[in-house]
Amino acid sequence: MIKDEFLIKSWYIPLDFFSADDEGRTELPTDQKKQKAREEGRVLKSTEINTAVSLLLLFALFFFMLSYFALDLIAVFKEQAIKLPEVMRMSVYTMGFAYIRSIMGYVVLFFFASLAVNFFVNIIQVGFFITFKSLEPRWDKISFNFSRWAKNSFFSAGAFFNLFKSLLKVVIICLIYYFIIENNIGKISKLSEYTLQSGISIVLVIAYKICFFSVMFLAIVGVFDYLFQRSQYIESLKMTKEEVKQERKEMEGDPLLRSRIKERMRVILSTNLRVAIPQADVVITNPEHFAVAIKWDSETMLAPKVLAKGQDEIALTIKKIARENNVPLMENKLLARALYANVKVNEEIPREYWEIVSKILVRVYSITKKFN
């Protein structure tokens, strides 16, 4: 009985071993969270896309350089064939150095080309940025947690996906090699019967097919890998509701302070409106959602001017102040909306609105005159 209890306790695995580390992180990451992760060196990146694009460009460069490379080797061979008596007295190292010297230029060029290709492919995928934060020691990560390590190493979706991806690449690329070689086995077995030029052409065509289909397959793998890495990246940056609230609070400031600033702005706006509205000749309304105060003075203005405008709550304030100061209210839904959208405060009204505004002003003046 004691032995059974000991075994149960020894092999007991808590259920939270299989639960998500980020339990409760249900909110999508904000732009600020993504920017912070980028500054730390955590970016969305697919190594498979890098590999596929780099191999495609490097294979293209290789096959382009191949003809020039072959011509240089043939030139060295011809030079040594012409000077055969001298060559016979040379050491093997001296003879080989002539070939190495002609090859090294292409090797160096290919090396720097591969560095440039990888550099630019990475820039295209993640953009250009330099950060050293990922190299800084994270002392909070030193504490070893076997359950977390085992889960991330053996039971995570990333581990299974990478294992499946690696096995799939090995199997498919081996099958590509097998089928291409099998389809050309007749030509390969008779290479000794062809001329040197024909034999090289056959080998190059076979190599080209293998490279092309392998790169195409890696490109397809890269697309799926990018989609998977994107989902994992978003998942790793997900936030709790509390983190989102805290971030919004940091960005927008303390709610109490924000409400005080808003109230202060409302007081300032109301003060400005109480100065501007009494000077207006008419307030054009929507009637509920928009209000635009207009003034016209033929001696100082070339066209009527917008003194104040507002929407919703501000529109109600404008109408209230207008009533208190006996400024006429005229309802014209289309005009009120158009002036609110297209004319700024203290700007003159555009020419296309002159006719309709003049009619409203004439009507206002006639009513005011009759009232007086």
Swiss-Prot record:
Query: Membrane: is it a keyword of this entry?
Result: yes
Its principal location? Answer: membrane
User: Which BP terms in the Gene Ontology apply to this protein?
Assistant: bacterial-type flagellum assembly; protein secretion
| InterPro entries xref list | FlhB, T3SS_substrate_exporter, T3SS_substrate_exporter_C
Q: Which UniProt keywords apply?
A: Bacterial flagellum biogenesis, Bacterial flagellum protein export, Cell inner membrane, Cell membrane, Membrane, Protein transport, Transmembrane, Transmembrane helix, Transport
Q: Name one GO cellular component term.
A: plasma membrane
Q: Where in the cell is it found?
A: Cell inner membrane
Q: Which Gene3D superfamilies match?
A: 6.10.250.2080, secretion proteins EscU (3.40.1690.10)
Q: Where are the transmembrane segments?
A: 57-77, 104-124, 161-181, 202-222
Protein name listed in UniProt: Flagellar biosynthetic protein FlhB
Which source organism?
Borreliella burgdorferi (strain ATCC 35210 / DSM 4680 / CIP 102532 / B31)
